[in-house]
Amino acid sequence: ETEPSAEPTEQSATEHNIPALIAVNGDCIGWLSIDGTSISYPVMHTPSDPQKYLRQNFYGKYSQSGVPFLDSRCSMNGGNLIIYGHNMKNGTMFSDLKRYVDRDFLNAHRTVKFETTDGVQTFIVTEALKTNTSDAWYDRIAAEDGRQLILSTCYGSGKDGRLLIIAAES
């Protein structure tokens, strides 16, 4: 067994075989990728066990980096999508999200692709928001118009700091 590649990929999101990934692990709902970053990973969803993939790899084995996963409050049938991933010191998972605090980087890397069995959904990054776990950001974003993809990772020196990359469906 090899874990889905943590390396950047040049292939477009349409080349990921989502049904084959789901056949290996039924918790997989799609593939997230951002060109020009190392972010290219399967995305998991386990509403009854929200943090299952926090420290577990695609194959269910222990992994410090886990696998990006969809918030248990989210549904693929509509509404906002919130995906969590670790900010790993080795440059994997969502570590590249911290580069979005630089406005030039944000402007040059605005397109986020999320491929599911329904096809490729494209989102355009609109904001990088520094916040914390106690902030009411979820309610604010949930109230905004249009469907959004929010990528969330740890940020800063405290354990409660978060960086949110907010992208609007295009």
Question: Across the structure, where does each feature detected by a protein language model lie?
Answer:
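Solvent-exposed, non-transmembrane regions of membrane-associated and secreted proteins
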Residues: 1-170
